[in-house]
Amino acid sequence: MNVSKLRTFTSISFSLALAVLTMSLAAAQASAQCTQVISGLREPLGTALSNQGNLLVSETGTTALHSGRISILDSSGNRRTLLDGLPSAINDVNEPSGPAGLFMRGRTLYVAIGVGDVGRAGPIPGTTIPNPAAVSSPIFSSVLAIQFSANTEKTTTGFTLPVADQQALADGQTVTLSNGAGDRIMIRLVADFPNFIPFPLPFFAPNIKLSNPFQLVAVEDTLYVTDGGRNLVWQIDLLTGSFSTLVTFPPIVNPLFGIVPAGGPFLDAVPTGIATSDDQLLVTLFRGVPFPPGTSTVEKIDPLTGTDTTFIAGLKTAIDILPIVEDDATHYLVLQHASVGPFFASPGLVLDFDSPAGPPTVVANCLTRPTTMTLDKKAGTLYVSEYGGRVVAIPFAP
């Protein structure tokens, strides 16, 4: 995410009157509270529930190089490391960028790896250039597959990926890590997207557009990945590793241009969350700086044709979508990174849409910059990660 992308997590004050009105309505509707499960994580961006009932959490990293991590959380909030040392570095907007979305299928965990330090801010606001120094990892802007047994998940105290093995993965090798006690994990590169493409601007020809994989979902032998930097969804053939663009989302007019100093005349789409429903893909579009309310949407994508139609409109910084089927009917949980005004100073929300046309019910308004959500149906708990390092639990029985 560059200055007009999801990587920018800047805060700014917003209209007090609008905030009071919106949050009063939210408080009247919200029926759930956020119970902290854990804090102190390294900026968690992705979660997935394993078939052992544990919550797997991707942590994009700290200011330290290669501090990306996958953690295992039990229902009591006890944390163990599954894999540390994943690629992570400070990106072009001075934020850590590393592991992002997770998707678990059987005993294979798919992990999106963000853009890292591939780019740097250009000399003109809103521009990006290639990093003039050496990029710290050859597998930024990629997807990894991590295989591990149920016993390893139950007993491991953690593995660390050596820096040298990042190059081995880039070269197409499968990396096996063992702790000497019979536990091991196997890691392979599923897809390595172009780090960037040329994107010349009339006033700055060297400008580039960065690839920034964010969330992902698998359907049969295809993996679909949102890219918040390139404003598209990738499709990956899991049998061959080949990938192509399924759909690209165009920019829209910025309704706050000339009113809020930040941002240009148009808003990038910034696709974030992705899920499947009725053989279609649902993708949240976060939208770019200054993140105006009402411009964020959930899009419905036909995976056979790439046809894109708006499914839920009028949102604010939608970052995840979760379809829930009950008695042959489907309702939709939408996670908003913030609720009112430009930027992110307002609380995040979980909204429940019985119909795409709304209006939604506010499930929870007790969130601070949430990033993703995972439902444990058996426990009746919705887990939500927050950018500041927390995972919270929200009671939710569909």
Spans of features found by a protein language model:
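Short loop/turn segments that connect beta-strands within beta-propeller blades
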Residues: 73-78, 147-151, 237-241, 301-306, ...
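Residue-level signature of beta-propeller blades and closely related beta-rich strand-turn architectures
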Residues: 61, 115-117, 229, 287, ...
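A short loop-to-beta-strand structural motif that recurs across blades of beta-propeller domains
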Residues: 66-71, 142-144, 232-234, 296-300, ...
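C-terminal segment of classical bacterial N-terminal signal peptides
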Residues: 18-29
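Short, solvent-exposed loop/turn segments at conserved positions within beta-propeller repeat blades
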Residues: 62-67, 120-140, 228-229, 290-295, ...
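Residue position within the beta-strands of beta-propeller blades
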Residues: 56-58, 110-113, 225-226, 282-285, ...
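Beta-rich, blade/repeat-based domains predominating
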Residues: 40-54, 67, 88-108, 140, ...
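Beta-propeller fold detector
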Residues: 35-38, 78-86, 153-194, 244-258, ...
